[in-house]
A protein has these predicted regions:
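C-terminal catalytic domains of large/alpha subunits in multi-subunit enzymes
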Residues: 1-250
Length: 250
């Protein structure tokens, strides 16, 4: 895939499939380059060492060939016996099964007894998405996913009137979490490589947001355990909690 022409973004779990294809193609390309360099240097493939963009003879590093020169040689028909012209490789990858990520979320939730306002005091995540290609992106993905999940659990609600007209059509009516609604998070990354792809990846596209609503609901139920309520709907707005405590309010 010509990366400068086609881009699919870094969302979802594209790196599991697309990244694996790139890795396999890169390995095949390097093997081709080593084979071609060995023939150009007149040595065995095992005697060739790659140093960045230079291929050298292990026993005599002065004997070398630059990658650019190697690419020019590779473009010539018959440049090396048994090597197709061109310094390129194509590889297709189809995973044999889905590589599932896993994790556990813990939340500290407080409910104001007078206003029924829920406050999140802390959030902890232990997460295993396989090998981390870019830990910074993974960290940001989980933080953003938790914030998204908190919005679903506590704020975001689509409402309609009796005529079916939306009542939450603007950001004045449709509540989203603000920065002060998102607590500090402690995220622990586990790296258990998946055997289902060459890079050991599992993906981190959605797993950070899926447990949030459930763990917040469980924490609120625990906080209000003396009242004997059971949370079965989101979001847990003060009005919703008041209705749970006093169903006669409708």
């Amino acid at each position: 895939m010509p990366g400068g022409v086609v881009g699919t973004g870094d969302g979802g779990t594209r790196v599991v499939v697309g990244g694996s294809a790139v890795a396999l193609a890169a390995r095949a390309l390097r093997a081709k380059a080593v084979r071609l360099a060995a023939q150009q240097l007149g040595v065995a493939e095992d005697d060739v060492q790659q140093n960045g963009t230079v291929f050298v003879e292990r026993a005599n590093p002065e004997r070398r060939i630059e990658l650019g020169r190697l690419a020019a040689v590779a473009a010539m028909a018959g440049a090396a016996h048994g090597v197709a012209p061109g310094l390129e490789a194509t590889h297709y990858f189809q995973p044999p099964d889905i590589a599932y990520a896993s994790g556990a979320h813990v939340v500290l939730a407080e409910v104001d007894a007078d206003t029924m306002q829920v406050r999140i005091g802390g959030y902890w995540v232990s997460h295993d998405s396989g090998r981390l290609i870019n830990p910074t992106i993974v960290e940001g993905q989980i933080q953003g996913a938790v914030a998204l999940g908190l919005g679903s659990a506590l704020f975001e609600e689509i409402r309609y009137d009796a005529a079916g007209q939306p009542l939450t059509a603007t950001y004045m009516d449709y509540a989203l979490p603000r920065s002060d609604d998102v607590p500090p998070m402690q995220i622990d990354h586990l790296e258990t490589p998946s055997p289902l792809n060459p890079l050991g990846l599992k993906g981190v596209g959605e797993s950070g947001t899926l447990p949030v609503a459930a763990v917040v609901a469980s924490a609120v139920e625990d906080a209000l355990a003396p009242r004997g309520i059971r949370v079965e709907q989101m979001p847990l707005t003060p009005a919703a909690l008041c209705r749970l405590l006093r169903p006669e309010l409708g």
